[in-house]
Amino acid sequence: MAADTFRISRRRALSLAGVSAAAGVGAGVAAGRSAPDASAVPADPAALKYPFYGEHQAGITTPAQDRLHFAVFDVDDIPREELISLLQDWTIAAARMSQGGSAGEFAPDAGPYEAPPEDTGEAMDLGPTGLTITFGFGPTLFTAADGTDRFGIADRRPRALVDLPRFSGDMLDERISGGDLCIQACADDPQVAVHAIRNLSRIAFGRASLRYSQLGFGRTSSTSTAQVTPRNLFGFKDGTANLKAEDPAAVDEHVWVADSDDQAWMAGGSYLVSRKIRMNIEPWDRTRLSEQERAIGRTKGHGAPLSGGDEFTAPDFSMPGSGGKPIIAEQAHVRLAHPDTNGGARMLRRGYNFVDGNDDLGRLNAGLFFLCFQRDPERSFIPVQTRLAGSDLLNEYTRHVGSAIFAVPGGAAEGSYVGARLFES
């Protein structure tokens, strides 16, 4: 029995009650740049779904979901045709799963009885829960470390897909850095996100191998004005000044690659930077509130700048404090990261909290899995991170242990596949 869609149950509705109708409205703004009517918002949060095909890949301006499974793959020693075949298979499976369907042609409990199921089945009763699946290509997909043109696409590597520099203070683990291909699966149910990566990994067997992956929870940014600003594991509101889907002019300027931006195949796409940032939780928890707020440059409760106002009041970096020094310290995070002090540089943040248990000393292995999308990393992330790495007061409480960059192509047309213009135009 063919099955394009799982049987959807309301069993998970109560656990997903936090997915508000407002998130559905934000989804319409992100995808179509105009808010849908109320009838477009599903009564059951588990039924929330976003189109897979379109001008842009979903999972960028889509309202940030609550859960993440991020996976990075290295492509095996295969011919170009096999890489294209993998991308085609991934596209078909991702499109099905994003609509609440099976990864394969048959549902997990259907198909040939003496063959392995085409879908692992753990998401059968959960619904799509807002699942988005976003694909990206790393620098090493274009050119190997020894300079080899692996798949005949070295001359099509975009100028903006630079090798990220090693920033001051970086303590990078190469095992969780870099990579040929990335998949970002976001959903409001963690099992749905894990199911997506699990099945795409299974489909890749013999063609690409999992290099590393990361689970995330509690989004640390809002990509829609319908969403409240979340908090990171330091307890502060995070991403107050983030780009929002409801400002399409700013998104066009800072996120989407234009036709004239170098490689035409990247039009409608973006560049993704990932950074795994471990927080020194225990020292932070023993730090005075006054020092915490000084390091951030905002109040812990309401997220207002120390210069006054509410969360969304523009910081006054010239306002004097005690002793005549600026009330927002010169090394405060908000000052160093703010667009006003970075020549207007902006990016769309889409990060998540993570907790990977404890280390051997009993310290919490936790922090921020930072994700950001931008039109050109050399004009946004790289200069901003260079400033932060140099003097941010938060550096005492953080360690950057993973780093990667990916070219995220524009969305696929139905019947085509993600990245088709790279290989076929």
Task: Give the role of each language-model region.
Residues 1-8:
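N-terminal secretory signal peptides
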